[in-house]
């Protein structure tokens, strides 16, 4: 007798670590017989993997949960599961259950591996199921992962964060830093390369802290050096790096390791020493600029991207001018810019000197405009150069063109045959646009 097919629709908010968590949970569900749904309406299970780092992501989750009421009305047996960082906040899991009766299951960031058992509880009629756990030191290994790409893979190397920036909820919802064993990371990457994956991105809230908790004398630079020797692997990327912990040894490995790409995401957050100190970032603007100079001296073609925040409590016009000055001095290839939002449970949320919303709005628009000009100039400087591009497939916006990534993590589009997907090609850049490069394959 043929088993009834079951479908899951997964919706992910937030960072790359959340993307990986969704791939992992989807892999676990696949082991239960669930297949990816083509649409939300086809789903027997809706899995919403949430983020609470920024207010906008949290608000989108609330809106989505409200919209599911009609789907549950049409399909009462539909299971709605909410996971991720949002339920991990104190009291929020209970709030989700109270505000949204459509939700059958809530779990957090530390017990994703328990998802199949929790789903079975729901199917047995015990709903709602509240499955949020507090963090412990264990990092489960060997769990199935259903990756979106067969070419590039996320590989977490460290979970959690010990930094406690005054605006950030991550240490509270992800827990303290917990590194994976180096052999486990190397074995996973070797397995991916053997399966045909050509690029891995090593993930962590702060990859530069890797190994400190292991007591094995290994750090992130040493891990990178080991992974550079994996046969069949073409490229290694990593994110995110805390500027305070970016060592000269790591710079040396990035410069010398053939497979480590020349792209570094280096969140500055602000350019004012006063603001950086209040943020508890652990470095000054002078420290940051010195680090950038050392990176560029060792890796001349490096592309640098960053995160920047405006409107942090107490930020003055002079502080904001310092941030604009930092952006101009560094010359980022790209910047992810954000308006400060108070996050529940963080020190900065309770400070009295909150910046008015209209001031935040003006500053973010000015920052975006400055970075647009710099980013466009950086991309136009690529015109005439020949770049190595890993072809991903048809462009999402121009299906008649192929799209891929350079080693410096720039999107490159060009004419070509679909059969080039998964290959490395040399592309001469003809035009540098704001968000991508356009060119032609060199014969």
From Swiss-Prot:
It comes from the Bacteria. Residues 6-124 form the MTTase N-terminal domain. GO terms for molecular function: 4 iron, 4 sulfur cluster binding; metal ion binding; N6-isopentenyladenosine methylthiotransferase activity. Its main location: cytoplasm. Its cofactor is [4Fe-4S] cluster. It catalyses: N(6)-dimethylallyladenosine(37) in tRNA + (sulfur carrier)-SH + AH2 + 2 S-adenosyl-L-methionine = 2-methylsulfanyl-N(6)-dimethylallyladenosine(37) in tRNA + (sulfur carrier)-H + 5'-deoxyadenosine + L-methionine + A + S-adenosyl-L-homocysteine + 2 H(+). Pfam families: Radical_SAM, TRAM, UPF0004. It is found in: Cytoplasm. Keywords: 4Fe-4S, Cytoplasm, Iron, Iron-sulfur, Metal-binding, S-adenosyl-L-methionine, Transferase, tRNA processing. GO terms for cellular component: cytosol. PROSITE patterns: MTTASE_N (PS51449), MTTASE_RADICAL (PS01278), RADICAL_SAM (PS51918), TRAM (PS50926). Residues 380-443 form the TRAM domain. [4Fe-4S] cluster 1 binds at residues 15, 51, 85. Its EC number is 2.8.4.3. [4Fe-4S] cluster 2 binds at residues 161, 165, 168. Binds 2 [4Fe-4S] clusters. One cluster is coordinated with 3 cysteines and an exchangeable S-adenosyl-L-methionine. Residues 147-377 form the Radical SAM core domain. Disulfide bonds: none annotated. Catalyzes the methylthiolation of N6-(dimethylallyl)adenosine (i(6)A), leading to the formation of 2-methylthio-N6-(dimethylallyl)adenosine (ms(2)i(6)A) at position 37 in tRNAs that read codons beginning with uridine. HAMAP family: tRNA_metthiotr_MiaB. Monomer. Belongs to the methylthiotransferase family. MiaB subfamily. This is tRNA-2-methylthio-N(6)-dimethylallyladenosine synthase. It comes from Desulforudis audaxviator (strain MP104C). The gene is miaB.
């Amino acid at each position: 007798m043929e088993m009834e097919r079951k479908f899951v629709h997964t919706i992910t908010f937030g960072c790359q670590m959340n993307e990986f968590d969704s791939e992992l949970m989807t892999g676990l569900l696949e082991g239960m017989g669930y297949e990816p749904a083509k649409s939300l309406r086809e789903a027997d299970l809706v899995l919403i993997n949430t983020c609470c780092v920024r207010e906008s992501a949290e608000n989108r989750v609330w809106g989505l949960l409200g919209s599911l009421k009609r789907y549950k009305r049409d399909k009462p047996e539909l299971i709605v599961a909410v996971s991720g960082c949002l339920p991990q906040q104190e009291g929020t899991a209970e709030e989700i259950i109270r505000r949204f009766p459509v939700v059958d299951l809530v779990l957090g960031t530390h017990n994703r591996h328990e998802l199949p058992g929790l789903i079975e509880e729901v199917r047995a009629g015990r709903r709602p199921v509240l499955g949020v756990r507090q963090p412990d030191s264990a990092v489960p290994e060997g769990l199935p992962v259903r990756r979106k790409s067969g070419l590039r893979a996320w590989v977490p190397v460290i979970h959690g964060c010990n930094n406690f920036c005054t605006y950030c909820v991550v240490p509270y919802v992800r827990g303290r830093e917990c590194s994976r064993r180096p052999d486990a990371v190397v074995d996973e990457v070797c397995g991916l390369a053997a399966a045909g994956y050509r690029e891995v991105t090593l993930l962590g809230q702060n990859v530069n802290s890797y190994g400190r908790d292991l007591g094995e004398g290994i750090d992130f630079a040493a891990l990178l050096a080991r992974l550079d020797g994996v046969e069949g692997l073409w490229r290694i990327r990593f994110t995110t790096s805390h500027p305070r912990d970016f060592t000269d040894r790591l710079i040396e490995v990035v410069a010398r390791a053939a497979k480590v790409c020349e792209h570094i995401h280096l969140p500055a957050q602000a350019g004012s020493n006063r603001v950086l100190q209040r943020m508890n970032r652990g470095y000054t603007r002078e420290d940051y600029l010195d680090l950038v100079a050392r990176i560029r001296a060792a890796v001349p073609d490096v592309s640098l991207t960053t995160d920047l925040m405006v409107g942090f409590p107490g930020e003055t016009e002079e502080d904001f001018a310092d941030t604009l000055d930092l952006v101009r001095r560094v010359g980022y290839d790209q910047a992810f810019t954000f308006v400060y939002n108070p996050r529940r449970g963080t020190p900065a949320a309770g400070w009295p000197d909150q910046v008015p919303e209209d001031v935040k709005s003006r500053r973010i628009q000015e920052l975006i405009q400055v970075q647009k000009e710099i980013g466009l100039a950086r991309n136009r400087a690529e015109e005439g150069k020949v770049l190595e591009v890993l072809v991903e497939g048809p462009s999402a916006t121009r299906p008649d063109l192929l799209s891929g990534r350079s080693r410096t993590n720039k999107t490159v589009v060009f004419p070509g045959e679909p059969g080039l997907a998964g290959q490395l090609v040399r592309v001469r850049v003809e035009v540098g646009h704001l968000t991508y490069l356009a060119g032609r394959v060199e014969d």
